[in-house]
């Protein structure tokens, strides 16, 4: 996969290479998916509505497929990338829209897996408030996202751990650097104050 100079999900190359790329860059991706799936099962009622916010190719939807089917629940995947829409492979429907401008129905479960870091920081608070307002009583919003690194030496250790994981997963050092540089101004990790 060619790394764009400025990261985007709007190229065919990124979309078609996404599932492999994300697992190379984030060696714990499948473990995190499994954890989210386990938690999510506890909040999907019979006939419920689930939003996969920032659904990409449908990873979360695929992992929840059996539960959704058994409980006759609806899944709506939301993602702004038309290229991701073209290759989406999960139950439910795909809506091509920025997550923060979509008109949500009241829902039982919202899942935001590695998505908030791509929402402008100035829009995050209102977006999260809106999601909370739309979440039905007894429902849940699962957020799994990148946080700003800690300051000081511990931050250095954690950054190195991330880089080592990518390298040990077989990602070329040049590609790791290209990807990090391409995220400038596009990916803004969540701060602890948010």
Residue ranges and their predicted role:
Residues 114-118:
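Short catalytic micro-motifs in class I SAM-dependent methyltransferases
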């Amino acid at each position: 996969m060619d790394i764009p100079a400025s990261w985007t999900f709007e190229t065919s190359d990124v979309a078609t290479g996404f599932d492999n790329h994300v697992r190379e860059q984030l060696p714990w991706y499948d473990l995190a998916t499994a954890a989210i799936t386990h938690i999510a099962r506890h909040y999907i009622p019979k006939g419920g509505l689930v939003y996969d916010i920032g659904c990409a190719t449908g990873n979360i939807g695929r992992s929840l497929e059996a539960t959704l089917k058994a409980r006759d629940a609806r899944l709506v995947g939301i993602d702004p990338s038309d290229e991701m829409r073209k290759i989406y492979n999960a139950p439910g429907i795909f809506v091509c829209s920025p997550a923060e401008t979509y008109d949500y129905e009241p829902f039982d479960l919202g899942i935001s897996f590695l998505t908030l870091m791509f929402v402008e920081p100035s829009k995050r608070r209102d977006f999260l408030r809106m999601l909370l307002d739309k979440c039905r009583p007894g429902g849940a919003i699962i957020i799994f996202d990148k946080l700003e690194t800690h300051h000081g030496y511990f931050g250095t250790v954690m950054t190195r751990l991330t880089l080592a994981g990518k390298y040990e997963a077989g990602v070329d050092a040049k590609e790791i650097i290209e990807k990090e540089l391409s995220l400038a101004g596009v990916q803004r990790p969540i701060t602890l104050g948010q």
